[in-house]
């Protein structure tokens, strides 16, 4: 009898270890993808800023600080301490919402360079990867909306009339918000991945 119990314990441990290994692999892929997108966003924003006059940079930055991004509609941790206290599933759900919110706006960032043309397909790959992670980490004890039913408000002031330098401001806001949101997703996925290693230090 004892040998049977021991055998079942070993089998269960093996299955559990395999699930953790699979999740770690999926997390590694997702983190790599969002890291690439964040670096891409930083480069595109930096290149765009470099093309502006000093006064244009100052004015656009001032306007942006008073404006808002689509991510402001998505409830997320307010600081690093809340991020660390959030569950894996919550961090994944927020990340999914942030990535999904860029499906349409990302089309406005495409075109003109090979870097920009990487955005939409890489966002799609990342969204698929996060969805797989959500399903793999689904816990009935946690009640989060189905990802298919997540709704997001229109993208900031992007669809509103912006006045004189409308095109310039649109591009600045899109790139700045994209960079900001990819940094958020990178942080959330990195913390969630770290949770799979009990001995790891997940301090931000």
Swiss-Prot record:
PTM annotation (Pyrrolidone carboxylic acid): residues: 18
Residues reported in the UniProt entry to bind Zn(2+): 36, 186
Subcellular location as annotated: Secreted
Region forming the signal peptide: 1-17
Disulfide pairings: 69-177, 194-202
UniProt keyword terms in alphabetical order: Disulfide bond, Hormone, Metal-binding, Pyrrolidone carboxylic acid, Secreted, Signal, Zinc
GO cellular component, one term: extracellular space
PANTHER family named in the record: SOMATOTROPIN (PTHR11417:SF2), SOMATOTROPIN,PROLACTIN (PTHR11417)
Protein name: Somatotropin
Gene for this chain: gh
């Amino acid at each position: 009898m004892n040998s049977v119990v021991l055998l079942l314990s070993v089998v269960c441990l093996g299955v559990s270890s395999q699930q953790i290994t699979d999740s770690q692999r999926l997390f590694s892929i997702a983190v790599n993808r969002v890291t690439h997108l964040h670096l891409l966003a930083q480069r595109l924003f930096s290149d765009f800023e470099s093309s502006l006059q000093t006064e244009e940079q100052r004015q656009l930055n001032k306007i942006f600080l008073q404006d808002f991004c689509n991510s402001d509609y998505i409830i997320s941790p307010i600081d690093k301490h809340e991020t660390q206290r959030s569950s894996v599933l919550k961090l994944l759900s927020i990340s999914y919402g942030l990535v999904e919110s860029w499906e349409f706006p990302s089309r406005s960032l495409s075109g003109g360079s090979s870097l920009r043309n990487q955005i939409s397909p890489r966002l799609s790959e990342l969204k698929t990867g996060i969805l797989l992670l959500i399903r793999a980490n689904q816990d009935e004890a946690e009640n989060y909306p189905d990802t298919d039913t997540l709704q997001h408000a229109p993208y900031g002031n992007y669809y509103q009339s912006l006045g004189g330098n409308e095109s310039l401001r649109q591009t600045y806001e899109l790139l700045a918000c994209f960079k900001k949101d990819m940094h958020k997703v990178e942080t959330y996925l990195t913390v969630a991945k770290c949770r799979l290693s009990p001995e790891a230090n997940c301090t931000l």
